[in-house]
């Protein structure tokens, strides 16, 4: 990298660092700046191995400025960015559209209907976030119904029932009612019997492949014209468990020549030999399909509005046949696209995560590498931050992308004011500190915006620990934050006695550090793996569950303090 390009990198990095720091009211982070910097400046990319070092120096300088100085400097570099910070961003806020026809209902009732086959991943948070927001808006009611009527292919996990309710509470909502579909099997049987007596359902023993062929041709099953008495008798045999899996189903009569083959005489009940894991439901062998169970429940429980994926449009069309037969009015329906979430190497799928846990590749549902709500909660991310990001996606019927950086930015706004600051040095290199101007201790503030919280006292005897990438070139100065200015000479830091003006003038970068002879051993668990380091002694006084910021690294949640050191979970920059 030549000198001209290096200066351009410095200038662009400084703009990004200042903008980032002012926007989030926190110290800038190299990682948060590198992405947009390289994206906007393709000519920097061939020098990707050198750019981080330059950016690190710039970030250090910006970290040493107060808010007013940062703003003044950004105005000098790019007034448009200051104007952007000042602009009213309300027009950019995504708000949920009003629900249709709410005036037609005495009480708005919405439901989330999770399959309890495991704790929730991040994508699951969208439904309770939106439903909870709508019920708050309309003073409505939030219903949870566990759709747990498939004990074989989507086998429920007993622990998941409570885990999902805890996830909903974490997001900030409390359901008004909770149901388990497996408790309501007799209700579904009763409605099946009514349907049979109407002549609108029939038992069918055709192999699935044979029926599919007839369905494609628009040809009815030879079982379709059975009299209701025979159908009811065979259905009762299904209920009694007299058939084996795959031997008999109950079908709803629709239009066998319907233009959409998926709607032709769909299955309402089937036989499953695998017992349900819940003791209360373990004896059942005749199980309703989701479209039947859900359709009946939505009416009986009084759901007024249903939100479901765009890929489930056929469900409403199937269920409409039931509603017509029973004389019911179908709820209002809104469809949306799927959510794609970045920043994870793991497929965001409950079954995939479960397989990785069973294989020992993940430590559990709260492993920081797992894209689950339990994981981000343990990392110190507030449920409110997730809800705000999910609401920001709106209700588009197209697939939408959710950047984890959005959740991180929301969480930063929540925790930044409360999070005290500490130093953590990774891969620390010990460097002697010498010179007559050497202070006895450093006194960095607990929080840059709260002088009333006071300082941390960090005694320095003979040496400090710094990260290898922060060691300046021989003869250059660096500011040890809260301690003072030193010059790197002959593998040592020589205290210079310079005041903070050398940082404000842009001549000297700022780095964090730790005393070499008094530190706390820390293991930081991150989505990219575990990182170890040495924290300043005051970190030992933090409380478990406290959110703190390791300066120039990011926010973490304190998980435990022990004799062998402390464990924290990394939240975000």
Label the model's feature ranges.
Residues 110-117, 143-150, 299-307, 367-373, ...:
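Glycine- and acidic
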Residues 122-125, 158, 162, 182-189, ...:
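Conserved structured core elements
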Residues 198-353, 372, 411, 416-420, ...:
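Active-site cores that bind ATP or allylic diphosphates and position pyrophosphate for catalysis
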Residues 361:
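Catalytic core of tubulin tyrosine ligase-like
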Residues 27-35, 51, 364-450:
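Extended, domain-scale alpha-helical bundle/helix-rich regions
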Residues 2-31, 35-223, 311-327, 332-333, ...:
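N-terminal Rossmann-like or analogous alpha/beta NTP/dinucleotide-binding catalytic cores
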Residues 19, 105, 439-573:
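C-terminal accessory/binding modules appended to enzymatic or scaffolding proteins
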């Amino acid at each position: 990298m030549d000198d001209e390009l290096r200066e351009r990198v410095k200038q662009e990095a400084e703009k990004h660092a200042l903008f980032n720091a002012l926007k989030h009211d926190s110290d800038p982070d190299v990682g948060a700046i590198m992405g947009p910097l390289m994206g906007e400046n393709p000519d920097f990319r061939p020098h990707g191995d050198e750019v981080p070092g330059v950016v690190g120096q710039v970030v250090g300088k910006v970290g040493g400025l107060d808010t007013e100085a940062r703003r003044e400097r950004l105005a000098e570099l790019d007034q448009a960015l200051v104007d952007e910070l000042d602009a009213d961003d309300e027009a950019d806020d995504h708000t949920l559209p009003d629900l249709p026809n709410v005036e037609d209902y005495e009480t708005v009732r919405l439901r989330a209907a999770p399959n309890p086959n495991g704790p929730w991943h991040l994508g699951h948070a969208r439904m309770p976030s939106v439903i909870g927001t709508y019920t708050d808006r309309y003073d409505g009611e939030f219903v949870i119904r566990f759709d747990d009527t498939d004990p074989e292919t989507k086998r429920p996990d007993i622990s998941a029932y409570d885990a999902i309710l805890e996830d909903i509470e974490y997001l900030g909502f409390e359901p008004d009612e909770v149901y388990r579909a497996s408790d309501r099997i007799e209700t579904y049987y009763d409605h099946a019997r009514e349907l049979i007596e109407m002549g609108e359902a029939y038992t069918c023993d055709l192999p699935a492949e044979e029926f599919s062929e007839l369905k494609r041709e628009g040809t009815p099953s030879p079982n379709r014209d059975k009299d209701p008495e025979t159908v009811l008798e065979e259905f009762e045999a299904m209920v009694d468990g007299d058939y084996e899996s795959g031997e008999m189903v109950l079908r709803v009569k629709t239009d066998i020549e319907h233009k959409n083959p998926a709607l032709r005489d769909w299955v309402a009940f089937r036989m499953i030999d695998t017992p349900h894991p819940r003791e209360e439901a373990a004896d059942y062998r005749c199980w309703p399909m989701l479209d039947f169970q859900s359709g009946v429940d939505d009416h009986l429980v009084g759901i007024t509005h249903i939100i479901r994926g765009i890929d489930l449009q056929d469900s409403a069309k199937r269920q409409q046949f039931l509603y017509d037969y029973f004389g019911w009015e179908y709820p209002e329906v809104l469809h949306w696209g799927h959510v794609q979430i970045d920043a994870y190497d793991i497929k965001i799928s409950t079954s995939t995560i479960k397989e990785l846990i069973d294989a020992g590749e993940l430590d559990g549902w709260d492993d920081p590498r797992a894209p689950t709500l339990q994981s981000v909660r343990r990392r110190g991310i507030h449920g409110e931050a997730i809800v705000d990001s999910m609401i920001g996606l709106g209700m588009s019927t197209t697939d939408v992308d959710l950047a984890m950086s959005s959740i991180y930015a929301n969480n930063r706004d929540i925790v930044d004011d409360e999070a005290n600051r500490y130093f953590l040095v990774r891969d620390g290199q010990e460097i002697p500190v010498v010179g007559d101007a050497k202070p006895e201790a450093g006194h960095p503030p607990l929080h840059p915006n709260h002088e009333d919280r006071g300082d941390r006292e960090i005694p320095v005897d003979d040496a400090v620990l710094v990260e290898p990438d922060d060691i300046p070139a021989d003869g250059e100065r660096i500011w040890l934050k809260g301690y003072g200015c030193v010059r790197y000479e002959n593998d040592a830091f020589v205290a210079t006695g310079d005041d903070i003006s050398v940082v404000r003038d842009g001549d000297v970068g700022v780095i964090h550090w730790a005393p070499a002879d008094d530190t706390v051993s820390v293991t930081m668990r991150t989505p990219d793996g575990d990182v170890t380091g040495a924290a300043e002694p005051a970190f030992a006084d933090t409380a478990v569950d406290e959110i703190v910021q390791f300066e120039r690294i990011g926010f973490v949640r304190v998980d435990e303090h022990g004799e062998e050191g402390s464990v924290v979970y990394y939240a975000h920059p």
